[in-house]
């Protein structure tokens, strides 16, 4: 707080809070409150305390914020329904551009599960959209999988290793 005052800056009290975060936050939180340490949201990510895969050392982990995840899924679903009449090849090509953009922003360390879940939901929405186009040309799930082999969707990938 003193540092902010030095530069004539103020925090909005209703939007700010102090939380215990760091190496000993998990142990202290379990001892004091009997639960996991608090998390915070920033720039579409939820930051939480975790441990590294190879060692038991403290590690800051990020995952896609639940609210942003739902908003992005809803926007993608609406986009698919708006563009359901374009040819499949073009639809998948444009959808891949959107998917890669999502992966590039949210593809950070420890977030592969969330971007994988995003792809899973997008695949289901695409299946529904393609089956709404015409009852004569609707896909079975096996036919849809074959179509995805011909026009594959972009796979999730970690683009930035933060920690």
Which sequence ranges carry the predicted segments?
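Non-catalytic terminal/accessory segments
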Residues: 1-163
């Amino acid at each position: 707080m003193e540092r902010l005052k030095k530069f004539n800056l103020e925090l909005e009290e209703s939007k700010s809070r102090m939380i215990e975060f760091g190496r000993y936050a998990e142990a202290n939180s379990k001892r004091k409150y009997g639960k996991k340490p608090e998390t915070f949201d920033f720039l579409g990510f939820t930051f939480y305390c975790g441990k590294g895969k190879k060692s038991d050392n403290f590690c800051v982990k990020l995952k896609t914020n639940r609210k942003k995840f739902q908003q992005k899924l809803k926007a993608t679903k609406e986009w698919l329904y708006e563009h359901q009449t374009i040819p499949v090849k073009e639809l998948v090509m444009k959808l891949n551009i959107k998917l890669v953009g999502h992966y590039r922003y949210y593809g950070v360390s420890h977030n592969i599960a969330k971007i994988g879940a995003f792809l899973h939901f997008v695949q289901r929405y695409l299946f529904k959209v393609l089956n709404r186009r015409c009852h004569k040309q609707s896909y079975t799930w096996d036919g849809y999988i074959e179509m995805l082999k011909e026009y594959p969707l972009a796979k999730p990938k970690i683009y930035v290793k933060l920690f």
